[in-house]
Amino acid sequence: MVYELKSPLLGFEEIKEFDLVEVDEMFAKIKAINNPSIEITLANPYALREYSFDIPAYIQALLDINAQSKVRVFCTVVIQNPIDESRVNFLAPLIFNDDNQTAAQIALSIKDYPDFSVADKIKNYVKE
């Protein structure tokens, strides 16, 4: 499904639209529409750990999120070899509103979410 990015994706400010493809219940990928060579791996944080945060009001307004909206959350992953050394950024989740195909990334404060990190090893959460 193609989403319009309503706020810049950190490090990829030129991306305005991307295709979201779910790989399985844990992983997904986004591929930039204007540059298909840009592909980012995502993880469903709820499949990995207990994960909760408040979506800021400005993001709710930007994505037209209300109590009935179908919202999904993913976090970026830096893939490593071996895969269990891959890193998940829990402090900058991507928010997807499936109702209107819009998305945005937010930067959470480590002060507000001290249990989250920008580079948690995935092996800390995946049971073998």
Curated annotation (Swiss-Prot):
Question: One matching Pfam family, short form?
Answer: FliW
Gene3D superfamilies, alphabetized: BH3618-like
GO CC, sorted alphabetically, is: cytoplasm
Localization, UniProt: Cytoplasm
Query: Which keywords accompany this UniProt record?
Result: Bacterial flagellum biogenesis, Chaperone, Cytoplasm, Translation regulation
Enumerate the Gene Ontology biological process terms: bacterial-type flagellum assembly; regulation of translation
- Quick one: where is this thing mainly located? cytoplasm
Protein role: Acts as an anti-CsrA protein, binds CsrA and prevents it from repressing translation of its target genes, one of which is flagellin. Binds to flagellin and participates in the assembly of the flagellum.
According to the record's subunit comment, the protein's assembly and interactions are:
Interacts with translational regulator CsrA and flagellin(s).
* Family affiliation: Belongs to the FliW family.
Protein name (database record): Flagellar assembly factor FliW 1
Q: Which organism does this record belong to?
A: Wolinella succinogenes (strain ATCC 29543 / DSM 1740 / CCUG 13145 / JCM 31913 / LMG 7466 / NCTC 11488 / FDC 602W) (Vibrio succinogenes)
Encoding gene (name)? fliW1
